[in-house]
């Protein structure tokens, strides 16, 4: 019965969408569609309240916001105290400002921004499709398909079937990455960065269509290109290469087709992109300086296996919609023969972002972000097919749409709320408080009795959120007790997060050795090496160690360098002092 739930939900969503199409000529039709468009997100937040706080890297993003509120700009890494954050923090600065202004928790602000970004993206996609095909129904299909379901390959029963084909897995022909679809899953996550990037990318597409497809171009569209590029560079710089590559590709295609006639527009577009990067160069320098090369995104021009796997994966992913486009090829040919430059521009962007997914590689697989943009743009382009199906083969259209929505339905029903959380909480104003009295007493002491730049050694990863202070280094000791069976708000291990952000192993390994010394059950004494390392740090910052069991308490209490400053049950806080009594 559980397997039928996504199918039933998909059919219900398709029925609701068809109803929205039916009333789209009503003066409130578009607003009703917008409401329907954000309902899946509202449903997730209402059905799984913890998802809003814990989802994906929820604690990571909240802890960065708290670092900024504490006065750290640029923020330090909350799980690598004192080290600058090698991760885009533009959206966290925005969220921190709203949190301080409205006295709402970061999780609440992230959720509100997600709803706003989703609604604005739906509007922009509708406008883009309207520009392409001059058809309101096609616009509704574009918004629907690009956000909610452009492929059914990545999640659901079909995806599970593909992953069971041993031949594909063994010869590495197919590399499934469920993070890429459905696009709405990006709008459900915290961080307000990826989703803002998708919105700004849609604004970029909308702007260049106006620039190249109108004889007289308002300066406002050059300005919006500038703003979209600047915004992406600040809020989600990984999409900046996609804007640059798409701009150059579109300029090349248009110059080849139109010649010097569009030269002024081409130069104007390139100038906007270049000028938009100048103001954020110091910011980009800050978040990239110090990254090790192994964390970088590189070209995989000579990695045959990678290129073949990425190409085959992309082909399988888009095959369902390609079949439908091929089915409606006569209609597509008619559109292209009408010299529809806007469609050519959109196809160019689809191909460019697809090639970026194929030819770029990174140890963390972060190139999947370009797959998101390609599928998102392909969803807009393919709307003419579904518009025609709706007019001429409505039952087939209903069945196909229901199938395409199965991944989203699976995400809503299962992926967004399966795991129990590790730490029950209460939201009050700007902050999260732990429901367990002893734990809450610990974090209350930390947040009220220690300096904002104090750093802590702890076997848990909770202090950056509940105590709003930095960890000397994030340890994965606690995770070993529950593995991946619970949601701790970080999703990835601390070790992986630091590695993905590009911190040198020399720094992280040293700190991990020092911090782990306190929780090593095989020894009963703090090493001189650990004391010496903390002594250097304590010259600039107060250093505290949290003990959560009797053995660790006894071990730390033996050292003359640590003074107990807090105790609640078996949990205690010790402050490091280089002065020996």
What feature does the model see in each segment?
Residues 30-31, 265-277, 334, 341, ...:
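Signature aromatic-anchored transmembrane alpha helix within multi-pass, membrane-resident enzymes
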Residues 3-4, 48-58, 82, 103, ...:
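Membrane-helix boundary/interfacial segments in multi-pass membrane proteins
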Residues 390, 402-581:
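Extracytoplasmic
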Residues 25-28, 212-221, 257-270, 323-349, ...:
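Membrane-interface helix-loop-helix junctions at transmembrane boundaries of multi-pass membrane enzymes
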Residues 37-200, 237-238, 423-433:
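Active-site lumenal/periplasmic loops and adjacent helix-entry segments of GT-C-fold
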Residues 221-237, 248, 274:
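Membrane-interface alpha helices of multi-pass inner-membrane proteins
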Residues 1-28:
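Membrane-embedded, hydrophobic transmembrane alpha-helices
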Residues 115-121, 241-243, 363-389:
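Hydrophobic/aromatic-rich transmembrane helices and adjacent perimembrane loops
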């Amino acid at each position: 019965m559980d397997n039928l739930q996504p199918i039933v939900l998909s059919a219900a969503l398709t029925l609701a969408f068809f109803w929205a199409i039916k009333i789209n000529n009503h003066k409130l039709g578009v607003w009703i569609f917008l409401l329907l468009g954000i309902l899946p997100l509202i449903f997730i937040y209402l059905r799984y309240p913890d998802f809003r706080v814990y989802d994906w890297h929820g604690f990571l993003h909240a802890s960065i916001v708290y670092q900024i509120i504490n006065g750290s700009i640029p923020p330090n890494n909350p799980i690598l105290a004192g080290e600058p954050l090698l991760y885009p923090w533009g959206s966290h600065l925005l969220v921190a400002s709203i949190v301080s202004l409205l006295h709402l928790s970061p999780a609440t602000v992230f959720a509100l921004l997600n709803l706003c970004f989703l609604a604005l993206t739906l509007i922009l996609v509708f406008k883009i499709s309207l520009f392409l095909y001059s058809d309101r129904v096609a616009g509704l299909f574009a918004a629907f398909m690009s956000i909610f379901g452009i492929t059914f390959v990545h999640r659901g029963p079909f995806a599970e079937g593909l992953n069971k084909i041993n031949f594909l897995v063994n010869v590495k022909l197919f590399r499934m990455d469920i993070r890429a679809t459905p696009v709405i899953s990006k709008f459900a996550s915290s961080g307000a960065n990826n989703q803002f990037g998708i919105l700004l990318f849609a604004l970029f597409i909308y702007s260049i269509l106006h620039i190249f497809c109108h004889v007289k171009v308002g300066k406002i569209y050059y300005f919006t290109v500038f703003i979209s590029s600047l915004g992406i560079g600040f809020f989600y710089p990984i999409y900046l290469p996609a804007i640059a590559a798409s701009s150059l590709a579109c300029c090349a295609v248009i110059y080849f087709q139109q010649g010097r006639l569009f030269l002024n527009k081409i130069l104007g577009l390139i100038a906007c992109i270049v000028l938009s990067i100048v103001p954020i160069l110091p910011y980009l320098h800050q978040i990239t300086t110090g990254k090790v090369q192994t964390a970088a995104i590189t070209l995989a021009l000579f990695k045959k296996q990678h290129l073949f796997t990425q190409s085959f994966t992309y082909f399988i992913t888009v095959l369902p919609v390609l079949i439908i486009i091929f089915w409606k090829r006569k209609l597509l040919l008619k559109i292209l023969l009408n010299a529809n430059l806007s469609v050519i521009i959109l196809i160019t962007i689809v191909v460019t972002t697809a090639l970026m997914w194929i030819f770029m590689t990174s140890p963390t697989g972060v190139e999947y972000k370009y797959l998101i943009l390609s599928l998102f743009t392909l969803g807009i382009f393919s709307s003419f097919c579904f518009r025609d199906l709706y007019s001429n083969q409505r039952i087939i259209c209903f069945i196909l749409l229901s199938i395409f929505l199965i991944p989203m339905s699976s995400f809503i029903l299962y992926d967004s709320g399966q795991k129990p959380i590790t730490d029950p909480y209460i939201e009050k104003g700007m902050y999260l408080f732990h429901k367990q009295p002893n734990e809450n007493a610990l974090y209350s002491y930390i947040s009220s009795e220690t300096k904002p730049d104090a750093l802590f050694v702890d076997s848990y990863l909770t202090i950056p959120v509940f105590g709003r202070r930095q960890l000397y280094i994030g340890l994965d000791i606690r995770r070993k007790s529950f593995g991946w069976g619970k949601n701790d708000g970080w999703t990835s291990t601390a070790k992986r997060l630091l590695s993905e952000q590009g911190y040198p192993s020399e720094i992280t390994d040293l700190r991990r050795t020092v911090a782990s010394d306190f929780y090593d059950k095989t020894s009963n004494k703090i090493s001189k090496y650990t004391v010496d390392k903390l002594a250097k740090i304590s010259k600039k910052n107060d250093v505290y160690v949290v003990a959560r069991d009797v053995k660790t308490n006894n071990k730390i209490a033996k050292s003359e360098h640590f003074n107990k400053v807090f105790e609640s049950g078996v949990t205690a806080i010790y402050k490091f002092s280089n002065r020996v009594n």
